[in-house]
Amino acid sequence: MEPLEKGKIYRAVIDGYSSEGLGIARVDGAVVFVPHAVRGEDADIRITKVMKTSCAGEIVKIHTPSPDRMEPDCPYAGRCGGCAYRHLTYPEELRAKRQRVQDALTRIGGLDLQVEKILGAKNPEHYRNKSQYPVGADGSIGFFQA
């Protein structure tokens, strides 16, 4: 298996999500993490970083969009680092979050348990419950720039 090349474009299908909400594609046996990707999408992916056991990439063109892709309603989505699932329909967001827990229990915990379906919010908007406060080397504290 040849290593993937930084800057080169490969065609792949997104087959799942990482624990951080990145799409996961497999190209010639290599795992590629792709932000703003949706499970089931067939896309051209440019390799942006080659690491020891995986690669990072970005979508160049979507050949077959997922029916679970939606246009984010937030103008900062994809730039501020706070809404990893904003481009997903709410049912797909819940499936992705359920998969995250299932993967942690099975692959990391070694447990043979089945995670129940997530009971979603009645109103899937305006329920943000996470905030990141990065601390700089100089001691400054603040939000990521959008």
Identify the residue ranges that each predicted region occupies:
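Non-catalytic accessory regions of SAM-dependent methyltransferases
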Residues: 1-146
